[in-house]
Amino acid sequence: MTNPVRWLFSTNHKDIGTLYFIFGAIAGVMGTCFSVLIRMELARPGDQILGGNHQLYNVLITAHAFLMIFFMVMPAMIGGSGNWSVPILIGAPDMAFPRLNNISFWLLPPSLLLLLSSALVEVGSGTGWTVYPPLSGITSHSGGAVDSAISSLHLSGVSSILGSINFITTISNMRGLGMTMHRSPLFVWSVLATAFPILLSLPVLAGAITMLLTDRNFNTTFSDPAGGGDPILYQHLFRFFGHPEVYILILPGSGIISHIVSTFSGKPVFGYLGMVYAMISIGVLGFLVWAHHMFTVGLDVDTRAYFTAATMIIAVPTGVKIFSWIATMWGGSIQYKTPMLFAVGSIFLFTVGGLAGIVPANSGLDIALHDTYYAGAHFHYVLSMGAVFALFAGFRYWVGKIFGRTYPETLGQIHFWITFFGVNPTFFPMHFLGLSGMPRPIPDYPESYAGWNALSSFGSYISVVGIRCFFVVVTITSSSGNNKRCAPSPWAVEKNSTTLEWMVQSPPAFHTFGELPATKETKSYVK
């Protein structure tokens, strides 16, 4: 990092991918700090560390959600892993629009600063990540905090849209000779299946929050019934973005897991085409189920019946993916190295979260479970565990390719087990809290919920130790004192891998390929 010009004006996909990883790590640490503050407040009944400032509690909730979704998972998963891997995997010299790639990243730091500054303006933005009116309206949040948070969302949304345009163009037009779409690795497909929902859903969010901005500042009444508006309109627009967003966060992770499971089972992925069409199906179906977040707003009974059925149908392509991963492992010679541990952990935790989600998909049951800790448990199992474990798995899988040095295997496995035994006690008790009726955005609660909350808070402290362990591993791996050079193919996968990143040196040259590779066969698995 000694040459600032190289990093400020870089058009190299590997440099920009590295910047995304660093940014995601910084935002992730901030988001984790906020979550630990939340858990410290909830560790016991009554007012704890926040001294009864319930608005501050909601500001922490809001900042935690935005940081983790828009500034940690999306930049690290799509920006970091996508930028580093996609051009190499398809045999392209770089991304299609290198300078657009640069501005996509550099929109994020000012966006993050806007979000953090919103917490310092008057009483902060305590709206939750949904920013629903009338709570986000000018009467409830009179200062500039919500406006600052909305501006932050606009900037990060532009960044994501530009990035997705870049990925779609790169994958469509810049594949190497012989690299047809049906020969493309599954991670490439997963990024493509993520880029289209980003491109289609984020402009809808932009429209919704722009309406909110004009309601707050220019006296429009899009969300005010007194002027002919309707707050439910905003909910529809936000959720039309919000549900595809969940799949935007998890789909690249499923591509990473497919690579890892194949490599460490010593077998090609079972049902490659089925996996491709499952990812596309998830991307499409994600747009057809948004109102399952809105069963309590007074929807027509037929509408609720449709959204219940459509939500359950999403379980079909998800099941195809999970059974394909299990079939890939079945009968394979499995090596439980750190990436494989995180991949298997991600599959297990994602499955638990998905099964928990089938319950509130029923509109009748959701009346009881809506906005309780059951919903918090469900989406944290899918995201905080499914997506983040996939991120850890992918980082460990490709870290030798990035740094050119191997990571300490024992420490990596310790990181996995500490994190696994941290996140489960954190989020599993939330199912019981939700079933008991504990509502979500509250900093105080009756004594009857104290036991599960204490266990949940204890688990979050263990998770912090796991994150500390992760940074120790990264520091050791990247340090100049680490003399364990990484081979071009550290997992010895030449014979059972068809992906191009193992054919180049570690780390790859500034320009990855001296001459562009030609893909001549679809099956290079040699017995």
UniProtKB/Swiss-Prot annotation:
Cross-link (1'-histidyl-3'-tyrosine (His-Tyr)): H243-Y247
Residues annotated to bind heme a3: H378
Residues noted as binding Fe(II)-heme a in the record, renumbered to the chain: H64, H380
EC number(s) per entry: 7.1.1.9
The protein's name: Cytochrome c oxidase subunit 1
Recorded GO CC terms: mitochondrial inner membrane; respiratory chain complex IV
SUPFAM superfamilies: Cytochrome c oxidase subunit I-like
Segments traversing the membrane: 18-38, 59-79, 103-123, 149-169, 186-206, 246-266, 269-289, 312-332, 339-359, 375-395, 414-434, 454-474
Pfam families: COX1
Annotated binding of Cu cation, by residue: H243, H292, H293
Residues at which O2 binds: Y247
Pathway: Energy metabolism; oxidative phosphorylation
Subcellular location: Mitochondrion inner membrane
Names of required cofactors: heme; Cu cation
Tagged with keyword Cell inner membrane: no
Statement: the UniProt record of this protein carries the keyword Heme: yes
Entry superkingdom: Eukaryota
GO molecular function, one term: heme binding
Origin species: Oenothera berteroana (Bertero's evening primrose)
PANTHER family: CYTOCHROME C OXIDASE SUBUNIT 1
Keywords noted in UniProt: Calcium, Copper, Electron transport, Heme, Iron, Magnesium, Membrane, Metal-binding, Mitochondrion, Mitochondrion inner membrane, Respiratory chain, Translocase, Transmembrane, Transmembrane helix, Transport
Predominant location: mitochondrion
Known role: Component of the cytochrome c oxidase, the last enzyme in the mitochondrial electron transport chain which drives oxidative phosphorylation. The respiratory chain contains 3 multisubunit complexes succinate dehydrogenase (complex II, CII), ubiquinol-cytochrome c oxidoreductase (cytochrome b-c1 complex, complex III, CIII) and cytochrome c oxidase (complex IV, CIV), that cooperate to transfer electrons derived from NADH and succinate to molecular oxygen, creating an electrochemical gradient over the inner membrane that drives transmembrane transport and the ATP synthase.
Protein's membrane topology: Multi-pass membrane protein
